């Protein structure tokens, strides 16, 4: 059991400011905060001569304790001197996460680690955001038609991957050679989530389940130049999903530009 505040901030509400009684040119201020989260965890390990199995389950109960977000305007407070509207979200949610992992050694001294991760929001509640115009939030474009607080909910504790997807497969293969001076590794992450996709035909509008196709792969080689210095070369490739219903908002589509080739030198003191 663990209780604490989330490590990542969340959308806590929106304030609308004006100049005196005039709200002709309002300033919309987005307020962030950190939810309080209680965590209940359960895990187990099974060992055999051939493989190792690990399982971890976490149940999370989180609440935004900011019942009031009233405060002076952070932008030009001399002009925007009056708070006209305030919309605290007061989020509450319960969600769970689980990981199942198997570790084994393959022929030729290759180590394999395979993992399945899942996340599900069990319940969610919040106040509404009665906003009828587009709002500019850093790194987030909000369409009034999609202005549902549940669309912006992200877990603040647990596996960080839950921000990207609710289900994923991991696979890691690595091998050490030359008296453990050289290490080769291959890592992949496959998005296994699904989402309803609306389709319009002559028979009307229908909903069809779409399986996500996001994929991340990395091939890495690390060589120990001496006891204190390692050199690494790695290639990372990220594939999105051009047919995903979320379009450019799909996280793997956003990450495609982060595909790269990198070189590293690490010195250990």
Protein language model features and the residues they cover:
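Long, internal scaffold/assembly segments composed of regular secondary structure
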Residues: 1-94
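Transmembrane beta-strands of outer-membrane beta-barrel pores
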Residues: 2-6, 48-50, 59-63, 116-122, ...
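Outer-membrane beta-barrel "beta-signal"
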Residues: 171, 253-269
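Residues that define the transmembrane beta-barrel architecture of outer-membrane proteins
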Residues: 36-40, 92-98, 165-169, 213-215, ...
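Outer-membrane beta-barrel translocator domains and adjoining extracellular loop/strand segments
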Residues: 9-17, 65-74, 124-131, 188, ...
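Repeated loop/turn-to-beta-strand initiation elements of outer-membrane beta-barrel proteins
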Residues: 50-54, 109-113, 179-185, 227-233
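Extracellular loop and loop/strand-boundary signature of outer-membrane beta-barrel proteins
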Residues: 26-30, 79-89, 155-160, 195-207, ...
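Outer-membrane beta-barrel architecture
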Residues: 43-45, 99-103, 172-174, 220, ...
């Amino acid at each position: 059991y663990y209780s604490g505040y989330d490590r990542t901030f969340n959308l806590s509400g929106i304030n609308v400011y004006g100049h005196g009684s005039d709200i002709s040119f309002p300033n919309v201020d987005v307020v962030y905060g950190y939810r309080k989260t209680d965590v209940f965890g359960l895990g187990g390990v099974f060992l055999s001569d051939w493989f190792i199995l690990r399982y971890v389950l976490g149940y999370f109960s989180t609440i935004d304790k900011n019942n009031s977000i009233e405060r002076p305007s952070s932008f030009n407070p001399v002009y925007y001197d009056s708070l006209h509207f305030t919309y605290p979200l007061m989020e509450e949610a319960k969600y769970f996460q689980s990981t199942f992992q198997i570790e084994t050694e393959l022929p030729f001294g290759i180590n394999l680690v395979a993992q399945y991760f899942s996340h599900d929001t069990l319940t969610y509640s919040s106040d509404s955001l009665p906003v009828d115009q587009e709002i500019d939030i850093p790194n987030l474009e909000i369409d009034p038609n999609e202005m549902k607080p549940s669309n912006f909910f992200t877990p603040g504790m647990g596996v960080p991957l839950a921000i990207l997807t609710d289900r994923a497969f991991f696979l890691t293969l690595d091998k050490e050679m030359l008296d453990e001076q050289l290490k080769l590794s291959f890592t992949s992450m496959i998005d296994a989530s699904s989402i309803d996709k609306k389709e319009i035909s002559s028979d009307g509008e229908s909903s069809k389940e779409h399986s996500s196709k996001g994929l991340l792969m990395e091939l890495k080689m690390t060589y120990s130049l001496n006891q204190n210095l390692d050199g690494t070369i790695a290639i990372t490739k990220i594939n999105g999903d051009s047919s995903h219903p979320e379009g450019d908002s799909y996280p793997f589509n956003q990450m495609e530009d982060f595909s790269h080739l990198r070189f590293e030198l690490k010195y250990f003191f």
